[in-house]
């Protein structure tokens, strides 16, 4: 609950500058370099919200989270004994993806000027993280999906369908909204540019 409130507050704060991020076809498009930097910033904000949700949930439940490494990858550990407190571990594991879904939902629902690069990055960060966790990241030693499956009656497949379904709905809503045209595809002088360019 606390994480959800923090997520809504975060969106309220981020919604204020969204007016300056809006894209109008009458205005010149942002330079490509600036656009991708802002997009990456938005994706970083989404990932920071994901990890912060884990930390805040653990603290709210009365535990002491810590950051460590799993096979060289930085990882937030709950500090919760999952054998003794499986429900609390489930809440910790679900907090990151749930917060990102709530942030994406708020962006898509709260009226504001839409389509800025930072906003697109936040949306892509939420969808991308979910896509990672429901595919190649679902079987990792410290995978959120794997921990949720171990600490609940839901299987990895069921959890993947739940979180993947929400992100799929977000993707469809983005695809249907003209403010998000060219979300990952943009016109170039030679046709279409797909994905990222380095």
Give residue ranges: language-model regions:
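Small-polar-interrupted transmembrane alpha-helices in polytopic inner-membrane proteins
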Residues: 77, 91-109, 118-135
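Hydrophobic alpha-helical membrane-embedded or membrane-associated segments
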Residues: 8, 38-42, 46, 100, ...
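Short juxtamembrane and helix-loop transition motifs at transmembrane-helix boundaries
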Residues: 53, 80-88
């Amino acid at each position: 609950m606390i994480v959800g409130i923090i997520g809504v507050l975060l969106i309220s704060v981020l919604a204020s500058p969204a007016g300056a991020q809006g894209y109008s076809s009458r205005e010149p498009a942002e330079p490509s370099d600036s656009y991708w930097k802002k997009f990456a910033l938005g994706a970083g904000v989404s990932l920071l919200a994901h990890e912060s949700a884990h930390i805040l949930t653990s603290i709210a439940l009365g535990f002491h989270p810590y950051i460590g490494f799993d096979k060289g990858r930085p990882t937030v550990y709950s500090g919760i004994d999952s054998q003794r407190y499986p429900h609390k571990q489930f809440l910790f594991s679900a907090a990151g993806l749930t917060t990102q879904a709530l942030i994406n939902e708020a962006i898509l629902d709260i009226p504001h000027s839409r389509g800025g690069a930072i906003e697109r990055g936040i949306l892509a960060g939420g969808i991308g993280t979910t896509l990672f966790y429901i595919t190649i990241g679902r079987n990792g030693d410290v995978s959120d999906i794997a921990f949720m499956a171990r600490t609940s009656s839901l299987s990895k497949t069921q959890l993947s369908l739940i979180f993947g379904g929400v992100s799929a709905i977000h993707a469809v809503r983005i695809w249907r909204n003209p403010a998000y045209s060219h979300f990952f595809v943009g016109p170039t002088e030679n046709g279409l540019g797909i994905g990222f360019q380095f």
